Amino acid sequence: FKGSYGAISLDGVTPLAWSLDHVGIFARTVDDAALVFAALAEPSRPPAAPAPAAPRLGIPRAFLERYAAEEVGTHLEAVARTLSRAGATVGDVALPDGWTRIDDVGRLVLRVEAAAYHHRWFPLHADAYPPKIRELVSSGQTVSGVDYLLAQEERARFRKAMTTVFESCDFLLLPAAPAPAPPLAEGTTGDPIFCAPWSFTGLPSLAVPSGLARGGLPLAVQLVAPMLAEDRLLDAARWCERVLEFTAEPALLEHGPR
């Protein structure tokens, strides 16, 4: 779970990209995440109206079909049917124009801001950086100021346009990742394509465990809410958690290092 951008203070957090960074919460249940968020959230957050008992959920169909593996897409449809039978309204929604560019634009912002933060140390200690971070910082140093500002302009347009999406639904429903969780030995958490847009726009989001893939590793669905609607998001996620009743545990030892 992560709240809206700025909902939890970044004081004391070493930044990766200051305009993208969020403090997130890993918890066993939605209730646990809500307790931690209540303790950490900025006290000036405005209260939000509670979410409807059975929410209106919008599936960004084109986004799903472009990036989700077949197994993940099939699982999301099964989850949507389960939620619909429990009373949720589920329909398709369209993301704003430019959604196909959001990942590239967000990565540009990430690269530049990482390069800016590390500009003092990187020339002296480049060899000490992990290869992926070294590549990230190096590539950010080559981006022009004009391109960075144009990316921020495109970001602002997309964020503003997202408000219209929530006129036809309470929350987006989509996978947490385009493929099942990768084995531990691969050393990666997977492709962030379904999560990155919400860091880019600052919208709150929450992933709910919802099943196991054919290989026994976890699957999860994700809810995305309008800005500053964390309380409503947590209410809706509690409802989804109760409806889905997912309690199985992946066979983690089978997928760890030998």
Where are these regions (language model features)?
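Acyltransferase
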Residues: 70-94, 119-124, 148, 152-169
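Small-aliphatic-rich amphipathic alpha-helix that forms the alpha element of a beta-alpha
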Residues: 161-164, 185, 189-209
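Short, surface-exposed loop/helix-turn segments at secondary-structure junctions
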Residues: 106, 149-150, 154, 177-196
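Short glycine/threonine-rich loop-to-helix capping motif typified by GTGT followed
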Residues: 70-72, 102-112, 183-189
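Flexible, acidic loop-helix segments that line cofactor/substrate-binding pockets
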Residues: 52-63, 93-106, 130-143, 253
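Structural helix-boundary/capping segments
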Residues: 1-65, 77-82, 86, 149, ...
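Short helix-loop capping/hinge segments that flank enzyme active sites or metal/cofactor-binding pockets
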Residues: 54-56, 108-163, 209-220
